[in-house]
Amino acid sequence: MSARATRPRSRRGRHPLPGELDPVAESSEEVDANNGRFETKPELHQEYLGPGLQSPRNWIKEGCDVGSHAVLSLSPEEQCEPEVEAHQVLQEAPLDSGPAEISVPSVYETLQCRLSSLEAVVAALRHHSLSFPKSVEAEDRDQGAPGPFGDEKEDAGPGQQEAARLIERNAWLRLALCNREDELACTQASLQDAQAEKETLQRQVQELEDSLMQMEASPPTPILRAGRRNSNSSTSGAERRPWVPQDSSMAHPFLQRLRSDSSTQSFGCLSTQHPAPETYLMEDQMGQLQGSIEKLKCFNRLLLAVLQGYKGRCESLSIKLAKREAEATALRLALQYSEDCEEVYEVLLALKMAGLGTGVGTTKGDLQAAEKEASRLLMKKEATMEVETPQPSSEGSGVDKPTPEELASQLHGYVQHLRERWALVKIPEELGPVTAPKATMPHAEATVQAILEIQPGPTLPHLEKSQIQQDLAATRDRLADLVLRLQLTQREKRGLELREAALRAQGPAHQLLLQQLRWERAHFAGDGSSGGSSEDPSSEEEAGEDRQQHYQGPLALLDGQMGKVWDSENVSQELSASLARAIDLRAQLQSLRQQLEQVTQKGRTRRVQSAELSRELCKAHSALALAFRGAHRKQEEQRLKLEQQVARLQAQQAEELAVLTATARALGKPGAPQPAQTFL
């Protein structure tokens, strides 16, 4: 091992805290060891170095005096001040603070100490790198070139060795300087991050101060009043300080960071030596804010847990909803196939009724209607079926129309096709009993209320599935009632429209009758006025005038009255015709109403019959489905049994084949001849 590796190493800057690694001290051990080596051997400095290279302090002074940066020279005391201050701070910290503060070091204090030590080391290394080459060149010039004599070689040997060692040390110091510059850049970056964090902390402190000012402006809370009453009863005067948590480990991390801030520590001694009532009030409010923050954190964690629970429930409900939607789709398809089968059965029933009772009570029109309905269903079948080839329509082709028997056979094929489609649909099983939800949410709500320290208020409304189903059923009932009312209103509207049409038809007839009555009244009024004027002898002038009017009137209106009489006869004929037409319309309206009632009654009976038929068909379909499933299950079991038998037979055949093969090989292979046998 080299002498440099065996020398003791010293630490600079500060003493490391227990359980903490000091990267600055570890990386600067070699430089400190070399500096210590030069300090322990002053005779080497004075013997082999020049007068300007006797100590590192002289190197620093010469570097500052001769350097090209024009930097003011610093005394050794000024250069060592950051390190001494760091040592004093670190030596005073364990005395003032307990083990809890040592276990949680201050980030800013550590950064300041490391930065000051790094600046001092970098300055020393720069001055060393500037002074070492000059001192070595001066020493070489003073000593001169080595002579051929042995005494000069012996005198110059130690100097050359020392110069080589110094050159090697200079190269090593340059490498260490590069490493330290990298470390300094990293430290500056971390310092910038720390400054940014410090700014954020200052903003948070400003926000806290604003909130504290708002709290001061607001009325005091009951907890603060109780704390003040307790503090007034227990202390007096300047000792009225509210209770704060003494354990530093239980304090909030934000408060610890505020306490460890270098900007706040610079005023720590003054605040502890001369406390003020505002400081106590601030600490009281900070304690309350800390409690509120912890309470809000607990509440936030609880809300997150409740949210996770609700999220899981929502996911499970979404899965169940997707399953129910698939089941509803399957049921819808099955219902559609059942309705199609119902229509086909109705058409088949109509065809059979028309075919059996052609001479009893049915007409040819019913048979034609049934055939048209069957043709429509067959066209629908051709449109919906994808695999089968479409059949040509009977209307556009020259082929004769199919007979009812052919239509019935085709409809039976359509029914078979619908049954096959219906069998492919997976019908869900019957729903089991609805399980009651777990009582986890009320417990969570009670915990939330306990954390918030509020009185238990009204519980949140819980909508269970049964209640939702009841509300949905009630809504459906109301909707059905509204639909029924709408239908009744529409029927009343149709009746009113029919009455309005009848009244509109009667309007011209009534107008003609009104005109005839007015004309007759005017005519009778004219006759009466003429008779009265002839009988009145009161005045001769009036009698003469009346006579003139009486005689001139008929003479003047004779031709017009004949036309009016002729017109009145036409009007009376038209009026009688309109009255007869109105009577006919009323009779037709009455007959139409009766027919409508009959049609509605028939529709109701048909609906009832179709409902019964659909129920029977559903039962038949369910029975067929069960039978089909049973047959399919039996067929599967038989197939499995046959496959097992085939496998066993194959295994037996393989074994027999192997035995036969071995026997054949044994028989075909010639054995060794016996003593009494020959090959012949």
From Swiss-Prot:
Q: How does it assemble?
A: Interacts via its C-terminus with the first PDZ domain of USH1C.
Q: Region labeled Disordered — which residues?
A: 1-51, 134-161, 220-247, 384-405, 524-549
Pfam families, per database record: USHBP1_PDZ-bd
Give the keywords, sorted: Coiled coil
Coiled coil (residue ranges) = 179-218, 363-386, 467-506, 573-662
Which domain of life does this protein belong to?
Eukaryota
Q: What name does this protein carry?
A: Harmonin-binding protein USHBP1
For this UniProt entry, the molecular function terms from Gene Ontology, in alphabetical order, are:
PDZ domain binding
Q: Which InterPro entries match?
A: USBP1-like (IPR040171), USHBP1_PDZ-bd (IPR019536)
Q: Composition bias, kind Basic residues: at what positions?
A: 1-15
Q: To which protein family does this belong?
A: Belongs to the MCC family.
